[in-house]
A protein has these predicted regions:
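Membrane-interface "cap" regions at the ends of multi-pass membrane proteins
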Residues: 1-50, 63, 197-203, 222-229, ...
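Hydrophobic, membrane-embedded alpha-helices of multi-pass small-molecule transporters
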Residues: 20-36, 177-182, 190-252, 268-287, ...
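Transmembrane alpha-helical segments of multi-pass small-molecule transport proteins
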Residues: 26-29, 99-100, 126-152, 166-175, ...
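Extracellular loop-to-transmembrane helix junctions
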Residues: 42-71, 93-97, 238-239, 398
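Juxtamembrane transmembrane-helix boundary signature
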Residues: 57-89, 98-108, 112, 410-416
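Membrane-interface loop-to-helix entry segments
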Residues: 137, 141-142, 146-179, 193, ...
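Hydrophobic alpha-helical segments and their helix-loop junctions in multi-pass secondary transporters
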Residues: 150, 166-192, 206-210, 249-254, ...
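C-terminal membrane-solvent junction of multi-pass transporters and transport-like membrane proteins
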Residues: 309, 345-422
């Protein structure tokens, strides 16, 4: 086997790049998680079945477009998300704003998902065997297992996902089939559903669930060999798995009132399969949270580049401790606020690379200090999207537009380059 991956922020060399199929599995692993089923449930409760499926799928399609747009930057440069920000934000801006926010966000989500998994594991074990495993113990054990995959790196994530995604698909399909058998199809006819959400709100909700992932896409696409491979791995990784999970969430909610496949399996009398589904779906997503957190911690704390493993370990342990102390129940609100702060970062990266730098890797110029155009665009994007629009991902568009205006007054290093070469 290969040794654990060491580097964090240096460009990934040509010989370390991977084929698109292995990264499609990693992308799929990120998409299948309890929140993805929850998305289906929220849509199912707010609209009839077809609008729910179509609006949710459309949201995922926008996610794919966004991920391809940021992912190609990661692939062109071979750089992680926070490093891709060094042009639009400047090196200090990327360090103090971007990597700090990303790290907090990822560590928080690692802890929250770990808590969901730990609690469900303890409940299921109690129901199945009568053993009362304290939730703190479950959290810690599973947290460490999920964390070690991330410490090992993308190679381990890819191994995990190649085994677990097919297994999860089989369990999910079987669970849905059983739900039909147990509950019948009577509840699918939508007579009782009052449409309480507009179609476009459904699309927005679906995008919001993965908005942050759209922007941290380069953490994985930097391992791709070409733009074409990036499109393939993102599309085939995100879209089918996202939509299947969404549809199952919708159908299960309509049938049984319970959206989480693992809970449905426990209710129809297959708790063991339920636990496996829960653990795998959390593991494949959560390892990537810890992995991305580690990359950002390296930048935020200005660690040596070969300290990625230690940084990942620290991030995960902080997440597990926060989870065990029960702090995370109080900060879910804070984390949803964070997506307002993360989204405009995407707008700045996209504007600097695709418009100012004309989409060419040779024009990408990390600049020392702070690029105020990026910081202003980011801050205004976050404030406007939070106060006026109240839709997180609009921050991407606002950040993008304001950066292009601000950059006219505070030219980016990427522009001088694009002009000199042209």
């Amino acid at each position: 086997g290969k040794k654990a991956e060491v580097t964090a922020l240096q460009a990934i060399s040509a010989e370390d790049r991977k084929d698109w199929i292995s990264l499609a599995f990693v992308q799929a692993g990120i998409c299948v998680c309890v929140p993805a089923f929850l998305l289906g449930a929220l849509l199912a409760e707010a609209m009839p079945i077809w609008p729910a499926i179509i609006s949710g799928s459309l949201g995922y399609l926008i996610v794919v477009v966004g991920m391809v747009a940021t992912g190609m930057i990661g692939c062109d440069l071979g750089l992680a998300s926070c490093t891709c920000c060094q042009a639009g934000f400047g090196k200090s801006g990327a360090r103090f704003i971007v990597s700090t926010i990303f790290a907090v966000n990822m560590i928080g989500w690692f802890g929250i998902q770990n808590g969901v998994c730990g609690e469900a594991f303890s409940n299921a074990m109690l129901a199945m065997t009568g053993w009362d495993i304290p939730v703190v113990v479950s959290n810690t054990i599973w947290g460490i297992i999920m964390l070690l995959t991330a410490v090992y790196g993308v190679h381990a994530l890819e191994k995990l996902d190649k085994i677990s995604i097919p297994l999860l698909m089989i369990i999910m399909c079987y669970g849905t089939f059983l739900a039909f058998k147990v509950y019948g199809t009577g509840n699918l006819n939508d007579e009782g559903t009052v449409q309480s959400m507009s179609f476009m709100s459904g699309v927005a909700l679906s995008f919001n669930f993965t908005a942050v992932g759209t922007i941290t896409g380069p953490d994985y696409t930097r391992f791709q060999k070409s733009r074409k491979d990036t499109v393939k791995s993102v599309f085939y990784g995100v879209f089918p798995m996202g939509v299947i999970t969404l549809i199952m969430g919708i159908v299960l909610t309509k049938l049984s009132g319970q959206y989480d496949i693992s809970m449905v399996l426990i209710e129809v009398g297959l708790p063991l399969l339920g636990i496996i589904a829960l653990v795998i779906s959390t593991w494949t997503t959560n390892s990537t949270n810890a992995y991305s957190a580690g990359l950002n911690i390296v930048m935020a704390l200005k660690l040596k580049d070969n300290r990625r493993r230690e940084a990942t370990l620290i991030s995960g342990i902080v997440g597990i401790v926060l989870c065990d102390l029960g702090i995370l129940g109080h900060i879910e609100g804070v984390l949803s606020l964070l997506s307002y702060v993360v989204c405009p970062v995407g707008g700045v990266i996209l504007a600097d690379y695709w418009v100012v730098g004309k989409g060419k890797a040779k024009n990408f110029r990390p600049q020392d200090g702070v690029n105020w155009a990026g910081v202003i665009a980011w801050a205004l994007g976050a404030i406007i999207s939070y106060t006026l629009v109240k839709i997180e991902f609009v921050g991407i568009i606002i950040g993008f537009v304001i950066y292009l205006i601000a950059e006219r007054f505070i030219p980016s290093a990427s522009r001088d380059n694009a002009e000199n070469i042209a």
